Design a protein with these regions (language model features):
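DPxDG-like acidic metal-binding loop motif
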Residues: 133-157
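Short pre-catalytic strand/loop immediately N-terminal to key active-site residues, enriched for Gly-Thr
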Residues: 127-131, 306
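Conserved catalytic cysteine-centered active-site region
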Residues: 115-122
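Polybasic, lysine-rich low-complexity intrinsically disordered segments
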Residues: 2-3, 10-11, 15-19
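Short alpha-helical patches at coil-to-helix transitions and adjacent helical residues
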Residues: 103, 137-141, 176
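Glycine-rich active-site/cofactor-binding loop and its immediate structural neighborhood
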Residues: 316-318
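C-terminal nucleotide
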Residues: 18-35, 39-42, 46-47, 55-58, ...
Length: 357
């Protein structure tokens, strides 16, 4: 799927007697989280004043295409290319009545927007399975953008973020946060501040070209249980486990300090803070790491990486490394020798894009 800027937000197949078919395409970037994740899950951030997450949108994309059916054809087809799964319903009402779904994220978001008329909704993803780079969240934001264009709902990006968060919680049956959804919606590098009353995004005052030179992302394999690590930390915190609460407090403080180091282009301090964040995260939940993750980070560190940490809930998936730009070739070779796969990435500057024709 290829998207370029263009299209009109006024196209609505439900209101046009001339258009019987429309194609809407949306794409949204994934992200790497540099510090502070897990804290974005309500109400954890309320217990840690000043809590924030720091993340960067990257050029591994999730895609959503909607193709409307001819007038009178009420059938709804949901298709996922990346996991090779599809399902169909005779109508929207039939989809609402279904007891379970093969593609629950697609169905739950479609149910929120309540589109009129039949359509085929197709998704695809460049994120490897269980990568921990927010692939499902990017997918959800892309679906929201496409369905918003299709229905003329006129929702904001912040609305898409909260619809996506809630749909994911319904699907995985555990609490979810919002830090995974802001990079797909807005792109760039940002701090997601988490005060009482609701989160908000603040763009980092950082040279994105310079930061881009200093990031490496690698994939260490699919985790055994997606999303469970965050739930275990969440539950331990709510249950009053002092060690976990203290660990998240330090992670919160480190995230605030890392934001300052990045904005000051103090890369040495940024590396030290990322190492500290990763250390506290492993203490909170040792299963967040694996032997391959440890090997990849250790090998990269010996060859010029300043720091490395797992992305997302961990237990496998991706690792993000902060490096000296001159050491890139050595770091990438060390990652390969550890058995991991380097994923070429750039920083996405635009966030979700949607076009229709």
């Amino acid at each position: 799927l290829k998207i370029s800027r263009g299209g009109s937000k006024k196209n609505d197949p439900r209101k046009s007697s001339e258009k019987v078919s429309m194609i809407i395409e949306a794409k949204a970037p994934t992200r790497v989280d540099l510090a502070g994740s897990t804290l974005d899950i309500w109400p954890l951030y309320l217990f840690h004043p000043g809590a924030a997450t720091v993340n960067v949108a990257i050029s591994r994309y999730a895609y959503c295409t909607i193709e409307t059916h001819a007038r009178g054809d009420e059938r709804i087809d949901l298709v996922s290319r990346d996991i090779k799964r599809k399902e169909s319903f005779a109508s929207f009402a039939a989809m609402e009545r279904a007891a379970r779904y093969k593609l629950p994220l697609l169905a739950e978001i479609a149910k929120f927007f309540r589109p009129a008329g039949g359509f085929t909704l197709t998704t695809d993803s460049e994120a490897p399975a269980g990568a921990g780079i927010g692939g499902s969240s990017a997918m959800a934001v892309a679906i929201c953008a496409a369905l918003d264009r299709f229905t003329g709902a006129g929702k904001s990006k912040e609305d898409w973020i909260h619809i996506s968060r809630d749909a994911e919680a319904i699907v995985i049956n555990v609490p979810t946060g919002t830090q995974d959804h802001y990079p797909p919606a807005f792109g760039g590098a940002a701090a997601i501040e988490l005060p009482p009353g609701g989160e908000h995004r603040v763009e980092l005052r950082v040279d994105l070209n310079e930061l881009e030179k200093r990031l490496v992302v690698c994939y260490t394999g699919k985790p055994r249980q997606h999303g469970i690590n965050n739930w275990e930390v969440f539950k331990a915190h709510i249950d009053g486990k002092g060690r976990v609460r203290h660990g998240l407090e330090r992670i919160s403080q480190v995230a605030q300090q890392l934001r300052g180091a990045l904005e000051g282009a103090d890369w040495k301090s940024a590396g030290a803070l990322m190492r500290e964040e990763w250390s506290f995260r492993k203490r909170n939940l040792p299963t967040i790491s694996t032997r391959m993750i440890d090997r990849a980070i250790a090998g990269a560190r010996r060859n010029g990486a300043l720091a490395g940490k797992v992305c997302g809930a961990g237990g496998g998936g991706c690792v993000v490394l902060l490096i000296d730009p001159d050491a890139r070739e050595r770091v990438e070779r060390a990652i390969g020798e550890a058995g991991a796969e380097v994923l070429p990435i750039k920083i996405d500057r635009q966030g979700v894009q949607v076009v229709s024709r």
